[in-house]
Amino acid sequence: MKDVTKVALLIARAMCASSGTFVFELAFSITEYTGRPLGGGRSKYARRRRAISIARCHRCYRLWPPTVFTTRCDNKHCVPGISYNVRVAQFIDEGVTEVIPSVINKRE
């Protein structure tokens, strides 16, 4: 989770509103131990939708529909090659994660 401190501040603020004490260390440890939210865009449908949006295969990250030069992808039994574009693979698998900058990182 990239915005651990931002989520920890939100949890600490909610704890302060309900109990009256602001304990950031507890909120930070709660945030670290929680994983990615349930779902979170990691379904097969979401992967295929993101791959179609950038005209790539959701399995091997090659161009889809294939051109004359791309013959190894049939979109059913293909696998990633030895050197594939890691940024494209990360976008298809996880979605947009680094586009929105954190407000906390700007102040530091």
Curated annotation (Swiss-Prot):
The entry's keywords: DNA-binding, Host-virus interaction, Inhibition of host innate immune response by virus, Metal-binding, Suppressor of RNA silencing, Viral immunoevasion, Zinc, Zinc-finger
InterPro entries assigned: Carla-bd
GO MF term list: DNA binding; zinc ion binding
Keyword Cell division listed: no
Source superkingdom: Viruses
UniProt KW Ion transport keyword: no
Protein name as it appears in the record: RNA silencing suppressor
